[in-house]
Amino acid sequence: QFKISADRYIKEKSSIAVIGLSVHTAPVDMREKLAVAEELWPRAISELTSLNHIEEAAVLSTCNRMEIYVVALSWNRGIREVVDWMSKKSGIPASELREHLFMLRDSGATRHLFEVSAGLDSLVLGEGQILAQVKQVVRNGQNSGGLGKNIDRMFKDAITAGKRARCETNISAGAVSVSSAAVELAMMKLPKSECLSARMLLIGAGKMGKLVVKHLIAKGCKKVVVVNRSVERVDAIREEMKDIEIVYRPLTEMYEAAADADVVFTSTASESLLFTKEHAEALPPISLAMGGVRLFVDISVPRNVGACLSQVEHARVYNVDDLKEVVEANKEDRVRKAMEAQAIITQELKRFEAWRDSLETVPTIKKLRSYADRIRASELDKCLQKIGEDNLNKKTRRSIEELSTGIVNKLLHGPLQHLRCDGSDSRTLDETLDNMHALNRMFNLDTEKAVLEQKIKAKVEKTQS
């Protein structure tokens, strides 16, 4: 039955695919249902690779995107299994999910990841945080042993592309982050004359929260209240940023702190809402000098502030999707910078595809070496028997063994050179594959079916156990 299954896939090379949604394709209320906390990435990878047609997997989940990268033994079946997994996880029907998902294959999927890493697909062009998040996928995968060789190499090459794009072009010059865009949005909504006197509250002292404080300083703010579960992170921010007064308040005093704030920034990992309509209605009114409206700027995914707060007369809520208003400025300059970075991405893409193409011949190389070594060992044994063990000392025996190994290596050198397709010479992939198929026929290696049979057999046995 495994040979029948292998025959079905023999003409279809395994595909690299990305299935996901981002700030460009789906609203935040859908993205938050699919968000996977970083500590749960290994579990998600384990669940994905247990699917029948998924061989490798990685998860990239941020406030602006949720993307799953896989190596699928079958494109159609693999995609269907991943979409069903996403539907089951989020509770969103697969038919509804498909309206917002994007799906890219092979070079399209790889180029997309490289563009993501370079900050070209970000809401904020060239922002640096996404590169750190791509790096974290690799670190997480290495610690948990969850990444396969294709996905691991693709993400590492994406990091290289992201670094080169920032170093060799001016794409990150003047680039803002989600945190700085949030501060900019708040300043746009406040009365201009009152920006510096507005009472600022930050809930959450993580990486993005720290950046909020940094950009408030850049805007000239002199004081910010920070609510956090523990005081240690707030102390660390206070130690680093001397140009602003930072007042710590524990999580138990969050609503009291909000009552004394004109602008509330939220940036926590909480999976439940911190502020609902009822909370906003219970807060005291804001002075008319401040516009009479309390601003909630929520850069968390899942969201910390309910959208229903905007139904409250004296409250307005903005989430990550609303930051587009800030970053749409200088659109022409953004396009020009992106074009400069695309040339670098194309170079890195060619290198990765050459490496992946070269993997097709690896099973043939292993089979040919094994075949040659079996013949060498058999003939060596016959030779040693004819000579007789009594007539051989250790040095002579070792010399004969080295001679046989050397002859085999010399004979294999030419054929193996013609199985290389790593971009180091002018040989095309088609030429290399023709050589591979010729060797398969000449030596009856039958490599492709053997490899596919092993993969399918392992998958079937895993699901049946």
Swiss-Prot record:
Chloroplast among keywords: yes
Principal localisation: plastid
Family matches, as CDD domains: NAD_bind_Glutamyl_tRNA_reduct
Gene3D superfamilies (UniProt xref): Glutamyl-tRNA reductase, N-terminal domain (3.30.460.30), NAD(P)-binding Rossmann-like Domain (3.40.50.720)
Pfam family name, one: Shikimate_DH
GO molecular function, one term: glutamyl-tRNA reductase activity
Family of this protein: Belongs to the glutamyl-tRNA reductase family.
Name used for this protein in its record: Glutamyl-tRNA reductase 2
Species of provenance: Hordeum vulgare
Organism lineage string: Eukaryota, Viridiplantae, Streptophyta, Embryophyta, Tracheophyta
Gene: HEMA2
